[in-house]
Amino acid sequence: MTIERTLSIIKPNAIKNNALGTIIHRFISANFNIIGMKMLHLTKAQAKGFYTEHQHKSFFNDLINFMISGPIVVLVLESPDAIRRNRDIIGATNPVDAIAGTLRADYADSLIENAVHGSDSLTAAMREINYFFLAGEVYGSMYQ
């Protein structure tokens, strides 16, 4: 199976609710290698740039205001089939639809404040990783 990289974001509500360590532990327990990690407090411009594909949707302003409301942690995860596996661990975007035991079922407060983000495709993963990380800030088997 092909080794992939994906981006995951631990969002402000999960950090505020002291779930950061538990969420990271769950990624590690699922055999992801964390090959890049940063804690950031996004500016409005950074949040708008990251979520640009949603700019014409009704929830855009609420999403941006939430994402700048506190610190986030961005992670580059590496494993075989990383994108699908990360999405499985995260759960459905709407926590009401998330399967018990997924991160969103356990830590999301609402559809907007849904605790975590995960890339949904290889193309998105590459774009999102490059949005937050320079090549020299990501380490792992793909770089050796």
From Swiss-Prot:
It holds the Pfam family NDK. Its cofactor is Mg(2+). It comes from the Bacteria. SMART domains: NDK (SM00562). Its main location: cytoplasm. GO terms for biological process: CTP biosynthetic process; GTP biosynthetic process; UTP biosynthetic process. Its EC number is 2.7.4.6. It is an enzyme of class 2 (transferase). It is found in: Cytoplasm. GO terms for molecular function: ATP binding; metal ion binding; nucleoside diphosphate kinase activity. It catalyses: a 2'-deoxyribonucleoside 5'-diphosphate + ATP = a 2'-deoxyribonucleoside 5'-triphosphate + ADP; a ribonucleoside 5'-diphosphate + ATP = a ribonucleoside 5'-triphosphate + ADP. PROSITE patterns: NDPK (PS00469), NDPK_LIKE (PS51374). Belongs to the NDK family. HAMAP family: NDP_kinase. Major role in the synthesis of nucleoside triphosphates other than ATP. The ATP gamma phosphate is transferred to the NDP beta phosphate via a ping-pong mechanism, using a phosphorylated active-site intermediate. Homotetramer. This is Nucleoside diphosphate kinase. It comes from Baumannia cicadellinicola subsp. Homalodisca coagulata.
